A protein has these predicted regions:
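Nucleotide donor/acceptor-binding cores
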Residues: 2-4, 118, 145-148
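Conserved SAM-binding strand-loop segment of SAM-dependent methyltransferases
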Residues: 52-58
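Short, conserved SAM-binding/catalytic segment
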Residues: 43-51, 108, 112-115
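Alpha-helical elements of Rossmann-like donor-binding domains used by nucleotide-donor carbohydrate transfer enzymes
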Residues: 17, 43, 60, 69, ...
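Beta-strand-loop-alpha-helix segment that lines the small-molecule cofactor/substrate pocket
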Residues: 62-64, 68-76, 80-127, 142
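Predominantly a Rossmann-like dinucleotide-binding segment in NAD(P)-dependent oxidoreductases
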Residues: 126-171
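Local beta-strand N-terminus motif with an aromatic residue
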Residues: 30, 51, 67-70, 144-147
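N-terminal Rossmann-like dinucleotide-binding module
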Residues: 1-49
Length: 171
C-alpha cells in the first residue's frame, strides 16, 4: 500500500500543526492544501516536504479526488458546512475540535454521518503527547488509585490571533 494521502482544509495554526505531525509519519503525505487565505497557504508550504496542490475552496478539492483523508482545520463555525460536502467522498475525516458550535449542528452531524464508511475522528491529539500518554497509562494501571477528579489549567494566551479574528468575534 502506498502513502496515505492527506488533504488539509484550513492552513492556519492548527492546519500547520497537523502538517508537522503528518511529516513524522512514514507512510503519509500531504497532497493538498485548501484555504482562501494566501498568506496561510504560504506559511504552510514552509512546513511541507513536497509541493501539494493548492485549492481555495473545499468543493474544488473534493472534485479533484486526490485524498484518502481530509483534515478540517478551519474556523470552528465552518466545520459543519464543510462536513456536509466532504462526507460525499466517503474518505476518512479528522475534524478539529469543537466538532460543532451549537446543539442543532451536533444533531445534524449525527444524522448525516450515521453509517459513514470512513473513520471520523475529532482531533484530540494531545492524548498522544508523551507526558499525557504516560499519565493516561498510569491512571489505567491503577498506580495512583481510583481517580475521582482531574483538573487542568492551561497557561497560555487563550485567543491566539487568527485570520480576521474569527476566534474572538465569530458567530
Amino acid at each position: 500500500m502506498g502513502a496515505l494521502k492527506y488533504a488539509i482544509i484550513g492552513s492556519g495554526t492548527m492546519g500547520r500543526e497537523h502538517i508537522r505531525n503528518i511529516n513524522l509519519l512514514k507512510n503519509a503525505e500531504v497532497v493538498a492544501l485548501c484555504d482562501d487565505h494566501e498568506a496561510s497557504i504560504e506559511e504552510s508550504r514552509k512546513d511541507l516536504k513536497n509541493n501539494p496542490r493548492i485549492f481555495s475552496h473545499h468543493n474544488d478539492l473534493i472534485e479533484a479526488k486526490i485524498a484518502d483523508v481530509y483534515i478540517i482545520a478551519t474556523p470552528n463555525f465552518t466545520h459543519i458546512d464543510i462536513l456536509k460536502d466532504i462526507i460525499k467522498t466517503k474518505a476518512h475525516l479528522l475534524i478539529e475540535k469543537p466538532l460543532c458550535t451549537n446543539v442543532k449542528d451536533c444533531f445534524h452531524f449525527k444524522k448525516i454521518t450515521k453509517g459513514y464508511p470512513g473513520i471520523i475522528w475529532t482531533a484530540m491529539e494531545y492524548r498522544y503527547m508523551p507526558p499525557v500518554a504516560k499519565f493516561i497509562k498510569e491512571i489505567q494501571s491503577g498506580t495512583i488509585g481510583d481517580l475521582k477528579m482531574f483538573s487542568i489549567r492551561e497557561h497560555r494566551f487563550p485567543f491566539l490571533i487568527k485570520v480576521n479574528d474569527w476566534n474572538r468575534f465569530s458567530k
